[in-house]
Swiss-Prot record:
Source organism superkingdom: Eukaryota
Protein name (record): Aldehyde dehydrogenase family 7 member A1
Induction (record text): By dehydration of shoots but not roots and not by heat shock or ABA.
CDD domains per record: ALDH_F7_AASADH
Amino acid sequence: MGSDSNNLGFLKEIGLGATNIGSFINGQWKANGPTVHSVNPSTNQVIASVTEATLDDYEEGLRASSEAAKTWRTVPAPKRGEIVRQIGDALRAKLDPLGRLVALEMGKILAEGIGEVQEIIDMCDYSVGLSRQLNGSIIPSERPEHMMFEVWNPLGIVGVITAFNFPCAVLGWNACIALVGGNTVVWKGAPTTPLITVAVTKLIAEVFERNNLPGAIFTALCGGADIGHAIAKDTRIPLVSFTGSSKVGALVQQTVSQRFGKTLLELSGNNAIIVMDDADITLAVRSIFFAAVGTAGQRCTTCRRLYLHESVYANVLEQLTALYKQVKIGNPLEEGTLVGPLHTRSAVENFKNGISAIKSQGGKIVTGGSVLESEGNFVVPTIVEISADAAVVKEELFAPVLYVMKFKDLEEAIALNNSVPQGLSSSIFTQKPSTIFKWIGPSGSDCGIVNVNIPTNGAEIGGAFGGEKATGGGREAGSDSWKQYMRRSTCTINYGSELPLAQGINFG
């Protein structure tokens, strides 16, 4: 491999070498763009190199994907589900090396890396069952001898643009459902995790080849913003799923909507946990610790705001601070590590700038707030006491920084939870049914994910994942999210000899 090749023999198990072609187009590995390096964030050493796609490569891929869609849409949905089942089995067979690759290239700890790959496997399993349930409603017609019902058909091509923090799981949320729905998929992985894009695509491509199906049913492109912009503006792609910042997501939405396409946006989260005076404190502290520190604060569902009832404030803060001071930071592939590196050097600079902004706005660093001296991108998980009115509290700092604030009653806590532009995930710790049902009701949390007595992160695939407000409004993975990947037609059939008109209209 590259200069960081010690103990990386597992990469060969998933088809990776020192140099790799970064795009799978029309059933072939080809790319004519620049060569980029995949970097290990624990050491900032090169793992391997990848050749990116050009816009000409993209165009070739889109033409092939459009043609493949004509074949794929005619395959019965349960047969499409069988292909996705085989994809899940292929990923399952390489669960350990793929999980290690996620830990190596992204930086999350090994348990989380393996968990991420398990998530795409779970999405495959979920989608297999879904392939036999893509049914529409039968609607009573007001006209005699008429039948009215819904039919769901494929959209065509689904574009999927994923982010570095979940470099393959988010693909699974989208691609598995899109494929069983009869769509072809064009995937642009994150520019800084190209090896994951290549490795996952190799396994998917082998399944289509083994079943004598067009390779262009699944297209993968490693590249930068030019490829993403091409996907957003391409009228041949009726649906674009984008995961990233609210700032970039707004541009994607604007570009896609100008051509009357549809978007699924999974954008910034600024998630809060509320601890009431009747909470199970031990359960709350454990949950906060995982929610705020897991993945080094680089989940969209990371807890960034902690609201503590004034009567439990000191107790919770003391216990949480003690946990923070004991956390093991280091190589994510080593046993016992709980916090790996931030993904890039620029992320470390953002962390440092964030700490400076916190201090300038009156924040008090309880613990952490520093960068570790090392070759890697390691920072110390940080707890901050700060006013709820501080500007930094309204923003997402994509790092392990937790803002801690007091409240007096439930109404104030809910208002604080809802006071930020984002609306992804939220959780409350309480034992009172009245508090629980107010929290999940119309006067409670305004987020897309509303939890009770569990962390803000670690969502299951069976529910629809997504948020409100500046988080984008998208819903992916489970529940009825599949409907966004298909085209609904309302069909009315007259099986009689008369022509009664709706609303009793008599026309001639």
